[in-house]
């Protein structure tokens, strides 16, 4: 009987994993041909010029946190760097984390997680940036993360429409924009040369753990009982041109 129960559980898990794989969201990340981008503030204009469309971060995965700010993002790459642009409207904003690798997820925060091809299934990178441009970069598996050092962090160009100084929570509706230029060299656990034709997986998030109205939104849906973004099993497919 125990053997049959184990077989049934295994079949169920295989079916669920297969359904998840077939249901994975997909994003094509176009290559844009620009010389070195000297400032992240240029990114929105570049993506406008290249007609890169916005995607919504709109999955509310946990009914205990129903608030859904308006969040859009778009992504492209230059070969040796990923360009990200977020546009967000929410009830309040906060940027208390004053240093890189701080608790930016407690602030108004936009995030990008990615698993590189050929890496171990449980390993992935997380790039988390608050609305004042403070950045956290981590790598490894859930519960065993290594933070990036000063050089990979400094290599990421950031721009926020709210400036770069920390501030306490500001109440009232606020629309803000964030842009990042993430070079291949900031993937500090790899000797990554470029993103050309890369087939990766990942997810895009918006959170604010300590805002007056906490929220946890994702681009690709997450089927877990409690808020958790560190879940590569629910990443979508990322196709780099």
Model-derived regions, located:
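Short, Lys/Arg-enriched N-terminal segments with co-localized hydrophobic residues
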Residues: 7-23
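Structural preference for beta-rich elements and adjacent junctions enriched in aromatics
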Residues: 22-241
């Amino acid at each position: 009987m125990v053997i049959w129960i184990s077989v049934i559980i295994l079949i169920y898990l295989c079916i669920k994993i297969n359904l998840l794989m077939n249901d994975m969201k997909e994003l094509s990340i176009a290559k844009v041909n620009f010389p070195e981008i000297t400032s992240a503030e240029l990114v929105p204009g570049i993506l406008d010029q290249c007609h890169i469309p916005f995607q919504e971060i709109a999955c509310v995965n946990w009914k205990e946190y129903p608030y859904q700010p308006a969040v859009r993002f778009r992504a492209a790459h230059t070969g040796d760097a990923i360009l990200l642009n977020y546009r967000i409207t929410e009830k309040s904003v906060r940027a208390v984390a004053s240093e890189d690798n701080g608790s930016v997820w407690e602030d108004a925060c936009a995030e990008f997680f990615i698993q590189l091809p050929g890496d171990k299934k449980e390993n992935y990178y997380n790039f988390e940036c608050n609305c004042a441009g403070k950045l956290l970069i981590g790598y490894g598996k859930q519960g065993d993360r290594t933070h990036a050092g000063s050089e990979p962090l400094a290599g990421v160009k950031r721009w926020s429409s709210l400036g770069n100084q920390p501030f306490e929570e500001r109440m009232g509706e606020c629309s803000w924009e964030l842009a990042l230029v993430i070079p291949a060299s900031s993937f500090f656990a790899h000797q990554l040369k470029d993103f050309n034709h890369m087939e990766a997986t990942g997810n895009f998030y918006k959170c604010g753990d300590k805002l007056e109205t906490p929220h946890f939104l994702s681009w690709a849906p997450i089927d877990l009982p409690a808020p958790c973004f560190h879940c590569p099993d629910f990443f979508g497919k990322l196709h780099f041109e």
